[in-house]
Amino acid sequence: MALVEFLMETLDGLKGTDIVHFDVRGKSSITDNMIICTGTSSRQVSAMADNLITECKKAGFETFGEEGKNTADWIVVDLGQAIVHIMQRDAREMYQLEKLWA
């Protein structure tokens, strides 16, 4: 299974909402794909990130790091070819990443 499809399905299974994918080839020098999803609370955002990393490792996808665990308003998981943003609704509305990458 391709990485992006795997990530989208896994996030959906983890009860992420408003999951969107952007192909950012030519727009970003750090990755080819951005995925953004929403969690309902800091606990859910943190758990989604932890479980996503676990599932990626089980499936053989390498993770290169994560940022934002301290507050869990917005956690970024770096998988090289894709970067996943797991955000609480307030953070997602404030930063409006969709407008940046659309």
Swiss-Prot record:
It holds the Pfam family RsfS. It comes from the Bacteria. The keyword Repressor applies. InterPro entries: Iojap/RsfS/C7orf30, NT_sf. Keywords: Cytoplasm, Repressor, Translation regulation. GO terms for biological process: cytosolic ribosome assembly; negative regulation of ribosome biogenesis; negative regulation of translation. GO terms for molecular function: ribosomal large subunit binding. The keyword Hydrolase does not apply. It is found in: Cytoplasm. One of its GO terms (cellular component) is cytoplasm. Belongs to the Iojap/RsfS family. Interacts with ribosomal protein uL14 (rplN). NCBIfam families: rsfS_iojap_ybeB. PANTHER family: IOJAP SUPERFAMILY ORTHOLOG, MITOCHONDRIAL ASSEMBLY OF RIBOSOMAL LARGE SUBUNIT PROTEIN 1. Functions as a ribosomal silencing factor. Interacts with ribosomal protein uL14 (rplN), blocking formation of intersubunit bridge B8. Prevents association of the 30S and 50S ribosomal subunits and the formation of functional ribosomes, thus repressing translation. HAMAP family: Iojap_RsfS. This is Ribosomal silencing factor RsfS. The gene is rsfS.
